[in-house]
A protein has these predicted regions:
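Long, low-complexity intrinsically disordered regions enriched in Ser/Thr, Asp/Glu, Pro/Gly
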Residues: 9, 20-22
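Positively charged n-region of N-terminal signal peptides that target proteins for export
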Residues: 1-4
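C-terminal motif of bacterial Sec signal peptides marking the signal peptidase cleavage site
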Residues: 15-18
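Sequence context surrounding c-type heme c attachment/ligation sites in exported
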Residues: 22-50, 55-60, 64-65, 77-161
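His/Cys-centered metal/cofactor-coordination and adjacent catalytic loops
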Residues: 67-69, 74
Length: 161
């Protein structure tokens, strides 16, 4: 009997461990901000350790307003889009380069449940190479351009369908 209970306990523990990484991100849409996001992507969970955008590894040609060249990283959540779009907690980090391939800025899309439903619930942030906040929140310059891709959850690079 003791062996059966011990076996059941082991199965339960293993099952719970398997679910730990699948929690839905519950960032508060009222308090999300660029300073905390920078700490997250530069220290706590460095974006440079994320995967490249699927099928696009390394620096590629860019265009305005992002720069002559870009390099795009995505966290694990952003690697799992569905027909409904990207899951909450998705982070898309784009390095924007000048023609001489000097890093000019970083532009971020962060999907936060309830943040801005009219614009796909994306929180937008722009940083200088040193982390200086150049813009954040419901940035109309970002929303205006990306709204033409509402059918792809406001994401340009490649279709997730």
């Amino acid at each position: 009997m003791h062996k059966i209970l011990l076996s059941l306990l082991m199965v339960l523990i293993i099952s719970l461990c398997g679910c730990a990484g699948k929690e839905e991100v519950t960032e508060d849409p009222e308090t999300v901000n660029a300073a905390d996001l920078w700490k997250r992507i530069s220290q706590d969970d460095p974006y440079t350790e994320y995967a490249f955008w699927p099928g696009v590894e390394g620096i590629m040609d860019g265009n305005a307003p992002h720069g002559a060249f870009i390099q795009t990283f995505v966290n694990d959540k952003a690697l799992e889009p569905t027909e409904a779009g990207y899951p909450y907690g998705s982070l898309i980090v784009k390095e924007n380069y000048m023609p001489d391939k000097t890093l000019a800025k970083l532009t971020i899309m962060y999907k936060v449940k309830g943040y801005d439903p009219q614009s796909g619930d994306w929180f937008w942030a722009v940083y200088g190479p040193d982390g200086t906040i150049e813009g954040e929140g419901r940035m109309q310059s970002c929303i205006g351009c990306h709204s033409v891709r509402a059918d792809q959850d406001h994401v340009f690079l490649k279709s997730y369908r």
